[in-house]
Amino acid sequence: FPELKTKYIDTGKARYILREFPFDPSAEAGFMLARCSKDNYFAMVDVLFKQQPSWVGVNNTKEALLQVSKLAGFTQESFESCLTDQKLLDDVRAVQKRGADEFKVDSTPTFFINGKTYKGAMSIEEMSAIIDPLL
């Protein structure tokens, strides 16, 4: 993402919109924590993506997420408060549902570039091959 941001977003050539699409409770928790970060939403999402191996698929996801969240300034109390906010969970799930229902998203990552759908991770070279002809 940093290369994509530098090459296209920061230069105004493209817009990037992140839509939350969690497939499991740990991903839901991650996006909830990002939302609780308020003005630091994207910084928290970035940390969560970079630290994914430390909290996805581990024995104690909640404890692992707490450790990652503490790096972002969460306390035990703010962490618990965030993850027990039912309205927040409902809001995250609503975004996921809309993606599935309206845009037929069924995997992550999924990219929409000029109305076309691309599924799966892509290198900056693969993204550039799609984006550059559209500029």
Where are these regions (language model features)?
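C-terminal cap of thioredoxin/glutaredoxin-like
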Residues: 1, 5-6, 66-135
